[in-house]
Regions:
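Short, low-complexity disordered leader/linker segments with a strong preference
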Residues: 1-22, 95-100, 359-366
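Extracytoplasmic "Venus flytrap"
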Residues: 15-41, 45-49, 54-67, 75, ...
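Structural recognition of the beta-strand scaffold that forms the well-ordered cores
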Residues: 23-26, 35, 54-56, 79-83, ...
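Short beta-strand elements in bilobed, periplasmic/extracellular small-molecule ligand-binding domains
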Residues: 47-58, 157, 180-203
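Hydrophobic alpha-helical
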Residues: 80, 85-99, 175, 198-262, ...
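Flexible loop/hinge segments that line or gate small-molecule binding clefts
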Residues: 95-139, 260-261
Length: 366
């Protein structure tokens, strides 16, 4: 299984081998586009491995994020996976889990060691913080911004969700990198990108931000909706349609819409990154193995699993994605049970390989 028997397992409250394992999930929303996909994938894993899952929705509000860990600890969880907002929230989360002897892993997030050195140092030495599953967000941002630039868009407005969110900051770095590279090479054809306006995690706020940009920027020809779970994008796309500007304002985003195929056809969307809802599954597997006593935390460190994005910019792309990621899960019941016995290097390899082609090769009838 995962390495040798851990030292920290000796200080667990009770043995988990004879009872059902309980894993808590601290998530911004378990009902929006990305959150509901994440929950379905986790529920499938819980069912396959007889794990009880407890969800707390915290809306990416800092006080609610830290409170969610206390709530899940009080519920008797053996492990917790968390999609926090700011790195600073992880100090409280890590300390709570250490005190309660509960294993903790992040999903869709990792601690920025440059921006948050104290939190990073705490995470490395904390016996119950075991790691993070996340994406290469700078490359994600860079790829999406270049989709717009290559379409000829030069006045790009930026919609974030929460100021200071670690993932948004990384995506923003990527957007800025694409813009600065283009501008350095095209002095007479520069791209202007706005400062971000923040839409939280609701469709109403997404619509309000899009309307604000359309009213204040007469040259606006593109909108980046950085994320927020999918609902802000629904609102923004709806506002652009109501203004009669569908196809005139090009939109890219992260977190796939349920009707992405239609939006690509009508011009409501230009391109999107997503398909990464298996990310929390890998955090689940890390915590599950730790609770089973099959994990040893590295000395002065922790483990990270990097999950790639899938990029879609045509209906042909989306049709294949829909077949293998919407109509079914990227991992079936048999594969989920097998993953529970995989080593960490094996899980890292599986995560790095996930793509439409990967799922197609595993699930197509031979």
């Amino acid at each position: 299984l995962w390495h040798l028997q851990p030292v920290v397992a000796q200080v667990q409250k009770t043995s988990t081998s004879a009872k059902q394992i309980k894993i808590g999930v601290s998530i911004w929303s378990s009902t929006d586009v990305l959150g509901s996909q994440s929950k379905k994938m986790l529920d499938a894993a819980g069912k396959a491995l007889n794990v009880k899952l407890v969800y707390v929705d915290q809306g990416h509000e800092s006080a609610a994020v830290t409170d969610s860990i206390s709530t899940l600890a009080a519920a008797g969880c053996d492990g917790i996976i968390i999609c926090n907002s700011a790195d600073s929230e992880m100090t409280s989360a890590i300390n709570t889990c250490n005190s309660a002897h509960i294993y903790l892993a992040q999903f869709y997030r990792t601690i920025n060691k440059v921006a948050s050195p104290q939190v990073y140092s705490l995470a490395k030495t904390a016996p119950y913080y075991i790691g993070a599953v996340h994406e290469d967000e700078v490359t994600n941002g860079y790829t999406l911004a270049n989709m717009l630039i290559k379409k000829g868009d030069r006045h790009i407005d930026l919609e974030g969700w929460v100021a200071g969110d670690a993932t948004f900051i990384s995506r923003w770095q990527g957007y800025k990198k694409a813009v600065s590279e283009w501008n350095a090479a095209h002095a007479s054809d520069k791209v202007i990108m706005s400062a971000p306006q923040y839409a939280g995690t609701t469709a109403e706020q997404g619509a309000a931000v899009a309307n604000s940009f359309m009213n204040s920027d007469s040259k606006m020809d593109a909108l980046i909706v950085a994320g927020g779970g999918g609902d802000p994008l629904v609102g923004s796309v709806g506002a652009i349609k109501s203004a009669g500007k569908t196809g005139k304002i090009h939109v890219v985003s992260t977190d796939f819409l349920p009707d992405l195929g239609k939006q690509l056809t009508t011009g409501g969307m230009t391109g999107e990154s997503g398909g990464h809802y298996a990310d929390p599954l890998y955090a689940f597997m890390m915590v599950y193995n730790a609770a089973k006593g099959n994990y040893k935390k590295p000395a002065n460190g922790y483990d990270e699993i990097v999950n790639p994005y899938i990029y879609v910019s045509s209906t042909k792309d989306y049709d294949k994605y829909a077949k293998y990621f919407v109509s079914e899960f990227p991992y079936n019941d048999k594969e989920l049970k097998a993953m529970a016995n995989d080593t960490l290097p094996e899980l890292k390899k599986q995560a790095a390989a996930i793509s439409v082609k990967d799922v197609e090769s595993r699930h197509s009838v031979k």
